Amino acid sequence: MTYLEVRDLQVRFGRRQAVAVDGVSFCLDKGERLGIIGESGSGKSVTCMAILGLLPEHAHVSGSIRLEGRELIGLPERHYRALRGNEISMIFQEPMTALDPTMRIGRQVGEVVAIHRAGEGPATHEIVLEWLERVGIQEPPRVANSYPHELSGGQRQRVLIAMALANRPGLVLCDEPTTALDVLVQRQVLDLLNSELAERASLFVSHDLAVVRHVCRQVAVMKDGQIVERGLIDEIIDAPQHSYTKKLIAAARLDEVQP
């Protein structure tokens, strides 16, 4: 059975039914990664939010999203809450908006763990320190006792990765996870994701073709809510078929992040 199957996904907003995603289809198995590239407004992030069940109430969603054969479209919110952070997780673009500025890091990571793993295995605090260390954070106890503003951008992004992976989800959605980082830190975070996502199904959303090339073999190009081209990323870079893909490649800085 395919782990994630998206078929003819359509997302429309408001009374005028403005189309954000139009007929998107793809499949992912465990260990597979699909990069989705396109400019702002192309429907990349909306696709992720539809999978995660976090679209606003005025969104009209149709088609099919199946996780291990279970239909997610129309799933009651109480059931979706049990999936988020446990079977499906997301690494967001901007840590300072994803993290609570008034709460220490250890508590934030710990709450994600406690929601789904209360009473299981080692104490929550031990799991928090283990994951902070695993994502490459130096001095995990100190960082766990810190507030988000006391950390660097790279440290905050690593915290988000720890939060997304701590419950060992089968599907990870990465929404522009390195956009706010400088090139050196970006490379370090991409190397970390390459390692940690190896056994999971994952979507990697970005406007940056060079970044997607570093972590994905397959890529889908989105424009105006539709997938206009899909295939092996190196083949698409060498011989793009769609005019929009050609423009993206012409604008890309493919030498900044080497595979």
Predicted ranges, named:
Residues 56, 72-89, 107, 115, ...:
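ABC ATPase NBD coupling module
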Residues 60-71:
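Conserved ABC transporter NBD signature motif
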Residues 146-151, 155:
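Conserved ABC ATPase signature
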Residues 166-170, 199:
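A short, proline-enriched helix->beta-strand linker immediately N-terminal to the Walker B motif
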Residues 187-199:
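Helical segment within the ABC ATPase nucleotide-binding domain
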Residues 212-214:
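A short, surface-exposed alpha-helical micro-motif characterized by mixed small hydrophobic
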